[in-house]
Curated annotation (Swiss-Prot):
Keywords: 4Fe-4S, ATP-binding, Cytoplasm, Iron, Iron-sulfur, Magnesium, Metal-binding, Nucleotide-binding, RNA-binding, Transferase, tRNA processing, tRNA-binding. It comes from the Bacteria. Belongs to the TtcA family. It is found in: Cytoplasm. Binds 1 [4Fe-4S] cluster per subunit. The cluster is chelated by three Cys residues, the fourth Fe has a free coordination site that may bind a sulfur atom transferred from the persulfide of IscS. It comes from Haemophilus ducreyi (strain 35000HP / ATCC 700724). One of its GO terms (molecular function) is 4 iron, 4 sulfur cluster binding. Disulfide bonds: none annotated. One of its GO terms (cellular component) is cytoplasm. The gene is ttcA. Its main location: cytoplasm. This is tRNA-cytidine(32) 2-sulfurtransferase. Its EC number is 2.8.1.-.
Length: 316
C-alpha cells in the first residue's frame, strides 16, 4: 500500500510545484512588462508598497521583492500598512508577517474608521470618504519616508470594473491609470499588477498562504456598484471566454477618430480630399475580422534590460 501510494504522492507534489512555478513566472512577466511599458520603477527609486492585508497587496509585495533580487538596477522597497482602527482588526498579523520576510515596513495608525462612521449615515457606502482619507495619509507617509513611488495593488480586473463604473454612472470613458501623478505633482502612484488577472492573484495568494485580513469597512458592504459590475464581468467571462482579455486590449488600442470627444480629435479639420494624422477613415467594425474567441498562449519568461535602467521582461 505504502509503495503504491508514494509514487502517486510524488507525482502530485511535482504537478503542484510545476503549476505554482508556471503561475509565478506568469505574474513576474506581467508585472515586469507593466513596469517596463509604463516606466514605473527606475534606478534609485524607493517604492512604498501599500499593504492592506488583502490578496492583491500581498501578491504585489511578494512579486516586487522577487523581481528585485534579479533586477539590473538598485531600488528600495518599504511596505506600509494603514491601521484604520477598525473594531476587531488583528493588529499583530502584518507586523509579524513583514518582520518574518525581512522587509522594511511601517505601520501607520489613524482612526479613519471613526471619522467614516461619524460622517457617513448608516447604510450608505463608505468607499469614497475612506478612499480620500487613506490617500491623504499615504501621500503624507510617502513624503516622511522619502518614497519616490507609491505602489498600489489594483489589477487588470479592477481597471475594467472602473471603466464600466465610469461609463454607467459618471458618463466618462475612463479607467484606472497604471501610473499617475498626484494633484500637487509631488507623488507618483504606480499599479504594477495592471496586467495581472485576479484569478492568478487568488491562486498565488492561496498557494503562498498569505495571512489574509478581510475588510469589514468597505469591500464587504452589500449592494455596492463595484460588486455588481464585478459580477457582470465574471458572468461574461464564463459565458464568453476571452472577452475580458479583449476588453483590456481595447484599453490599449484607442482610436479617437472613432469616438465623439472633440478634445481628443479635431473633427472640424476633416475636409474633402485631405487625410490628417490620427484618422482611420471608414475603417470600422464591419471591415475588420473579429475573432469570436481568443487564442491565449502562455509564454516563457525572458528578461531584457534597457540602457536607461528600467526593468524590462520581454515575452517571446
Amino acid at each position: 500500500m505504502n509503495q503504491n501510494t508514494q509514487p502517486t504522492n510524488n507525482l502530485k507534489d511535482k504537478k503542484i510545484t510545476y503549476n505554482f512555478n508556471k503561475l509565478q513566472k506568469r505574474l513576474r512577466r506581467n508585472v515586469g512588462n507593466a513596469i517596463a511599458n509604463f516606466n514605473m520603477i527606475e534606478a534609485g527609486d524607493k517604492v512604498m508598497v501599500c499593504l492592506s492585508g488583502g490578496k492583491d497587496s500581498y501578491t504585489l509585495l511578494d512579486i516586487l521583492l522577487n523581481l528585485k533580487l534579479s533586477a539590473p538596477i538598485n531600488f528600495d522597497i518599504v511596505a506600509v500598512n494603514l491601521d484604520q482602527k477598525q473594531p476587531g482588526f488583528p493588529e499583530h498579523i502584518l507586523p509579524e508577517y513583514l518582520a518574518s520576510i525581512g522587509v522594511e515596513y511601517k505601520i501607520v495608525q489613524e482612526n479613519t474608521y471613526g471619522i467614516v462612521k461619524e460622517k457617513i449615515p448608516e447604510g450608505k457606502t463608505t468607499c469614497s470618504l475612506c478612499s480620500r482619507l487613506r490617500r491623504g495619509i499615504l501621500y503624507r507617509t510617502a513624503t516622511e519616508l522619502g518614497a519616490t513611488k507609491i505602489a498600489l495593488g489594483h489589477h487588470r480586473d479592477d481597471m475594467l470594473e472602473t471603466l464600466f463604473l465610469n461609463m454607467f454612472y459618471n458618463g466618462k470613458l475612463k479607467s484606472m491609470p497604471p501610473k499617475l501623478i498626484s494633484d500637487d505633482a509631488k507623488h507618483i502612484v504606480i499599479r504594477p499588477l495592471a496586467y495581472c488577472k485576479e484569478k492568478d492573484i487568488e491562486k498565488y495568494a492561496e498557494a503562498k498562504q498569505f495571512p489574509i485580513i478581510p475588510c469589514n469597512l468597505c469591500g464587504s458592504q452589500p449592494n455596492l456598484q463595484r460588486q455588481v459590475v464585478k459580477e457582470m464581468l465574471q458572468n461574461w467571462d464564463r459565458q464568453y471566454p476571452g472577452r475580458i482579455e479583449t476588453m483590456f486590449s481595447a484599453l490599449q488600442n484607442v482610436t479617437p477618430s472613432h469616438l465623439c470627444d472633440t478634445q481628443l480629435f479635431n473633427f472640424k479639420a476633416v475636409k474633402h480630399g485631405e487625410m490628417i494624422n490620427g484618422i482611420e477613415g471608414d475603417i470600422a467594425f464591419d471591415k475588420m475580422d473579429i475573432p469570436m474567441t481568443l487564442n491565449i498562449q502562455e509564454e516563457d519568461e525572458k528578461q531584457a534590460y534597457t540602457q536607461n535602467g528600467t526593468i524590462q521582461f520581454k515575452a517571446v
